[in-house]
């Protein structure tokens, strides 16, 4: 072979797993406890490829809740809920302003450039970090624009803000598919993105939004993407 990948050790609370220590964990059990996507995200986010890495139930729950549930999942939930409730699910023609264009650029740079470039280098944790910073930027934009307040003071501006968030969610979901394929696929379905329009090449299609609204697509009230994880009883007892 021209290239051989060397994986580091996966440590259980900082210790190598062995039968003599009685700390060997079945990965299938972890997947059942936390979900495959959350487990994949933790391992790729937390551990630099090729290096040793440590895991614990507490670490998985903390990372998944902080970044998937509270940040990415909450962003999707708030955005789609407000569109369904305040716009009756109808998106309409998009006319972005300065702050909106700035967020679009931030997310596009992360999802279309930084993330795939780092994955090409096998720097998975670095790529996910770039993606996560884009998620944080989106949540900061929500807090600054306060669409719930704009509903009373400037409904048209509220619409633009929600449209912007809808658009960036599509890039975020497409980009993170290699890490959390099930959940990102579910989000793309809620966004009305066809299964044959979810590749990295599709992100560059600037006409997708206009084509979507031309179909009369309406955003439905969303189902939670990442319910908060709880500590398994077995882990709490150990």
Please give the residue ranges for each predicted region.
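Conserved, charged catalytic cores of large soluble enzymes
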Residues: 76-115, 135, 139-154
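Short hydrophobic "helix-edge" motifs at membrane interfaces and signal-peptide entry regions
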Residues: 25-26, 110-113, 170-172
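Secondary-structure capping and boundary motifs in well-ordered enzyme cores
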Residues: 19, 30-31, 60-71, 96-107, ...
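Basic, alpha-helical terminal appendages of large translation-related enzymes
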Residues: 53, 117, 122-123, 132-238
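Beta-strand segments within the central parallel beta-sheet cores of soluble alpha/beta enzyme folds
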Residues: 3-6, 188-190
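Short, charged/polar, low-complexity loop and linker segments
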Residues: 52-58, 109-117
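Catalytic adenosine-cofactor/nucleotide-binding cores of aminoacyl-tRNA synthetases and other
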Residues: 8-96, 194-213, 217-233
């Amino acid at each position: 072979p021209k290239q051989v990948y060397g994986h580091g050790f996966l440590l259980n609370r900082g210790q190598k797993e062995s039968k003599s220590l009685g700390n060997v964990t079945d990965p299938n059990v972890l997947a059942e406890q936390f979900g495959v996507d959350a487990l994949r995200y933790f391992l790729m986010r937390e551990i630099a490829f090729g290096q040793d890495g440590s895991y614990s139930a507490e670490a998985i729950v903390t990372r998944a809740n902080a970044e998937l549930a509270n940040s990415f999942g909450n962003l999707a939930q708030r955005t789609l809920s407000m569109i369904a409730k305040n716009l009756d699910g109808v998106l309409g023609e998009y006319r972005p302003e300065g702050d909106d264009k700035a967020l679009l650029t931030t997310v596009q740079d992360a999802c279309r450039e930084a993330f795939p470039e780092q994955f090409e280098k096998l720097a998975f944790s670095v790529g996910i970090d770039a993606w996560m910073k884009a998620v944080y930027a989106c949540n900061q934009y929500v807090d600054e624009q306060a669409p719930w307040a704009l509903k009373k003071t400037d409904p048209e501006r509220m619409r633009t803000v929600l449209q912007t968030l809808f658009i960036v969610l599509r890039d975020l979901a497409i980009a993170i598919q290699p890490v959390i394929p099930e959940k990102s696929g579910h989000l793309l379905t809620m966004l009305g993105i066809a299964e044959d329009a979810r590749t990295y090449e599709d992100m560059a299609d600037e006409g997708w939004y206009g084509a979507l609204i031309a179909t009369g697509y309406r955003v439905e009230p969303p189902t939670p993407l990442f319910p908060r994880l709880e500590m398994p009883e077995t882990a709490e007892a150990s």
